[in-house]
């Protein structure tokens, strides 16, 4: 009786009593499943985990008396491993919100599990537009970027600058195939041609045979529909083979980590599309300074998005007083995102988080004035133009 009386007093004082009863397992639990050891680990990995921890620390008390916990795991770039871990976490660990890191195949698999278990799934590092198109779910948010935005940024810009004839070097799984298809659509719509493509396995060790096929095509542009370590190794190999004397490289998904690894001598003048840059404005620089102090490197778009997604999820839980997935998703879809990652970001009914993207040009060594000063913003691509429109969408939730 004393406990009930105390609870009644707290309710009268304005505490979120009903809400407290709606925190599952008395813990708000966030999980991150990403590549921690493979070709994509540098662009997300431990840096992504650190970014989520920063968000949890910055959020402070979300619901009085309820802890916020965080766990992370390596999916090894295997969809079955990702799905199994996600299912285990939902069933046994009580994870309320799952962040999907790099690799489209793993995120598509995790999105299915999250939808089945009715838990919030934030896809950060995966590029395939299927996550908010053909395979959209009521619980998926596709947060940072997608292959449509990359194609409409980099692909469109290069064709309009005279790069009409293309050949693709494509990572042979969901992300690479989506990126090639979406960029092909943009090329053809702008009067260009695709002369062919060659597929390589994820984590390929030798690109020589693939590049010889590309060279034989006599295309102007070699579109790199890959990312991370694969993009780095294919660019290095292209220079070693002298391919760049006859073809222009188009990195369709290049991260600042990749530029840092390759150096400006190899990457100067390259166009790329990014959704975020550490040196964009005062807000991005302030957050990146804190991140740099922990990781000793500047953050990628994905690591910044990991922070933003976790923070905005926790803001939703705090506002509602519950981690109920349906209520949280409804709140997120009606609330604009304004933080160091996105300005006036909107989560549509299909789960796509719409925000501006940026066409970047990599600086010449002589133009770079301080460490990690790598990009010049060529153009802003408004979110409404970057992503699929309602007329183009195949998502049953957005009709």
Question: Predicted segments — roles?
Answer:
Residues 3-9, 21-399:
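Extracytosolic ligand-binding ectodomains
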Residues 15-21:
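Sec/Tat signal peptide C-region and signal peptidase I cleavage site
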């Amino acid at each position: 009786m004393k406990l009930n009386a105390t609870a009644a007093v707290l309710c009268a004082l304005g505490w979120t009593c009903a809400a407290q009863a709606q925190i599952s397992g008395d813990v708000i639990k966030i999980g991150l499943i990403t590549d921690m050891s493979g070709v994509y680990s540098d662009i997300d990995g431990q840096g992504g985990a650190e970014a989520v921890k920063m968000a949890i620390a910055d959020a402070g008390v979300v619901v009085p008396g309820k802890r916020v916990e965080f766990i992370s795991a390596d999916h090894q770039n295997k969809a079955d491993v990702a799905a199994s871990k996600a299912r285990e976490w939902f069933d046994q660990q009580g994870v309320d919100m799952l962040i999907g890191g790099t690799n489209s195949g793993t995120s598509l698999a995790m999105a299915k599990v999250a939808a089945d278990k009715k838990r919030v799934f934030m896809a950060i590092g995966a590029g395939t537009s299927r996550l908010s198109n053909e395979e959209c779910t009521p619980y998926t948010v596709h947060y940072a970027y997608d292959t449509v935005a990359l194609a409409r940024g980099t692909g469109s810009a290069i064709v309009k600058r005279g790069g009409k004839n293309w050949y693709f070097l494509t990572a042979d799984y969901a992300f690479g195939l989506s990126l090639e298809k979406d960029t092909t659509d943009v090329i053809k719509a702008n009067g260009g041609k695709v002369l062919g493509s060659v597929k390589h396995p994820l984590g390929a060790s030798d690109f020589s045979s693939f590049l010889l096929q590309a060279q034989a095509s006599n295309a102007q542009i070699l579109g790199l529909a890959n990312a991370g370590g694969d993009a780095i190794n294919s660019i290095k190999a292209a220079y070693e083979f002298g391919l760049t004397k006859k073809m222009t490289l188009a990195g369709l998904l290049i991260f600042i980590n990749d530029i840092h690894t390759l150096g400006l001598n190899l990457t100067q003048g390259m166009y790329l599309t990014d959704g975020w840059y550490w040196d964009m404005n005062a807000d991005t620089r302030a957050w990146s300074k804190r991140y740099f102090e922990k990781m000793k490197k500047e953050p990628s778009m994905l690591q910044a998005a990991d922070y933003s997604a976790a923070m905005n999820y926790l803001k939703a839980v705090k506002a509602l007083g519950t981690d109920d997935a349906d209520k949280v998703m409804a709140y997120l879809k009606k609330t604009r995102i304004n933080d160091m990652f996105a300005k006036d970001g909107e989560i549509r009914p299909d789960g796509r988080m719409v925000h501006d993207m940026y066409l970047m040009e990599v600086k010449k060594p002589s133009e770079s004035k301080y460490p990690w000063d790598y990009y010049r913003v060529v153009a802003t691509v408004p979110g409404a133009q970057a992503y699929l429109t309602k007329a183009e969408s195949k998502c049953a939730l957005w009709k």
